[in-house]
Amino acid sequence: MFTMTTKAREVVRRVTSHPRIGATSGLRIASQGPGEDALGVRTATGPERGDEVVERDGARVFLDEPAVPRVRGRLLDAVTRNGRVHFVVRNRH
């Protein structure tokens, strides 16, 4: 199961709460392509076909199909570096 830290949930709720994005919005995590290690993150108005939806405490994350096995059993965290927030997928301890 993919989970989120409290800070990650707060940031996801904050970045997806803009009225123009809509009530069904969330953060979408997607594979960057075959053989790529990187995952892309962006706001989305809703899940795309085939996305797995993870929701906790009002924070919604949409995982594209290729990303699911790469994040299964892991933890989404939000860290601040140089005044900017970055999302990090890490192992659960």
What are these regions (language model features)?
Residues M1-P19:
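Long, hydrophobic N-terminal alpha-helical segment
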Residues T3, I21-P47:
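Short, structured protein-protein interaction patches enriched in aromatics and acidic/basic residues
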Residues R14-H18, L27-R28, L75:
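Short secondary-structure capping/turn segments at boundaries of alpha-helices and beta-strands
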Residues D37-H93:
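Detector for the mature cores of small, proteolytically processed
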